[in-house]
């Protein structure tokens, strides 16, 4: 399993050096909004501000995609992920794909 602190958007991990590259890893989650959630969000738009129903859904979806990416990296034998990014695409109205991806690597302390 890859520790969360060994996942970075940078292309290196300070204090460590890459000894092996396992390639691209990803976690993909596809979510749809429920009818009730859409109605609740519609009511929130009337008063303005943050639409918490969608914010919470987005945050949970990103978290799920992140965990799937870490799981994928661990299955390959990696202990870190570098160059991590998120992407999102609306597949159809109300259905969104969230992708977390990066490069799975093995790192060791730089002093070794």
Curated annotation (Swiss-Prot):
Gene3D superfamilies: Hypothetical protein apc22750. Chain B. InterPro entries: UPF0145_dom_sf, UPF0145_YbjQ-like. Signal peptide: none annotated. It comes from the Bacteria. It holds the Pfam family YbjQ_1. SUPFAM superfamilies: YbjQ-like. Belongs to the UPF0145 family. This is UPF0145 protein Acid_4599. It comes from Solibacter usitatus (strain Ellin6076).
